UniProtKB/Swiss-Prot annotation:
Family affiliation: Belongs to the NnrE/AIBP family.
Residues holding K(+): N120, D185, S221
Protein name: NAD(P)H-hydrate epimerase
Disease cited in the entry: Encephalopathy, progressive, early-onset, with brain edema and/or leukoencephalopathy 1: An autosomal recessive severe neurometabolic disorder characterized by severe leukoencephalopathy usually associated with a trivial febrile illness. Affected infants tend to show normal early development followed by acute psychomotor regression with ataxia, hypotonia, respiratory insufficiency, and seizures. Disease course is rapidly progressive, leading to coma, global brain atrophy, and death in the first years of life.
Pfam family membership, one: YjeF_N
Gene3D superfamilies: YjeF N-terminal domain
Residue ranges constituting the YjeF N-terminal domain according to the UniProt record: 65-275
Enzyme Commission code: 5.1.99.6
Length: 288
């Protein structure tokens, strides 16, 4: 048992119920009046955009998503780390709206961030860093680290903020349920193809057995980008980046946010993305 505690980077193995430990909360995303969907005034006289733009915004195929990405890099000269920082901040912001620290049973709330070997994993590292700044207690599992300066720097930034990294993944869903209040799935993004290999096949098997909520970044890992996966993990929160992908039509969780407020208007028009009007200075928009 002492080895397990040391491995997971937490002082105590806290026993608890295998149900999401989230207090009741109010609707997290509010904005000003907009044409983007049916709205109503709440008791404070503010507009509540609870019903959002999921039937209007364009859902991208894998090919379209890749084309948009390439134009951002090549035509508009965005760098990978620049977009990764904006995406990761959006993810942390969406998590803070869906699961604010005050709604969680622990203080600070414990979050397990599982990062894959590509850019989606990089988004997860950035997300973990911002979650720490937002008052959460993230722990990272990053089993396949690319030998590239960008990812090495992201790891260093997290380590310098005293964010622990696990040496191995807990093998039992119950262990994760007991130690964490939320799991962030930052394993695979929209560019993933082929069969899921180890160690990620085993990781996804564990995630399917969780009772704590899962927040997936851009694509629920293991899903087909366009068709989804009814037998795969079922996140409670999906954070679509740039624009939703077609698989998001199969999402049945409670919260669907759009993040990544960096798309140039000309690019949005070219691909007819029909992105919603982000309220004020917000970097995320609730679609569902």
């Amino acid at each position: 048992m002492s080895r397990l505690r040391a491995l997971l980077g937490l002082g105590l193995l806290v026993a608890g119920s295998r149900v999401p430990r989230i207090k009741s909360q109010t609707i997290a995303c509010r904005s000003g009046p907009t044409w983007w969907g049916p709205q109503r005034l709440n008791s404070g006289g503010r507009w509540d955009s609870e019903v959002m733009a999921s039937t209007v915004v364009k859902y991208l195929s894998q090919e379209e998503a890749q084309a948009v990405d390439q134009e951002l890099f090549n035509e508009y000269q965005f760098s990978v780390d620049q977009l990764m920082e904006l995406a990761g901040l959006s993810c942390a912001t969406a998590i803070a709206k869906a699961y604010p620290p005050t709604s969680m049973s622990r203080s600070p709330p414990t979050v397990l961030v599982i990062c894959g070997p590509g850019n989606n994993g990089g988004d997860g590292l950035v997300c973990a860093r911002h979650l720490k700044l937002f008052g959460y207690e993230p722990t990272i599992y990053y089993p396949k680290r690319p030998n590239k300066p960008l990812f090495t720097a992201l790891v260093t930034q997290c380590q310098k903020m005293d964010i622990p990294f696990l040496g191995e993944m807990p093998a039992e869903p119950m262990t994760i349920d007991e130690l964490y209040e939320l799991v962030v799935d930052a394993i695979f993004g929209f560019s993933f193809k082929g069969d899921v290999r180890e160690p990620f096949h085993s990781i996804l098997s564990v995630l399917k057995g969780l009772t704590v909520p899962i927040a997936s970044i851009d694509i629920p890992s293991g899903w087909d980008v366009e068709k989804g996966n009814a037998g795969g993990i079922q996140p409670d929160l999906l954070i679509s980046l740039t624009a939703p992908k077609k698989s998001a039509t199969q999402f049945t969780g409670r919260y669907h946010y759009l993040g990544g407020r960096f798309v140039p208007p000309a690019l949005e028009k070219k691909y007819q993305l029909n992105l919603p009007p982000y309220p004020d200075t917000e970097c995320v928009y609730r679609l569902q």
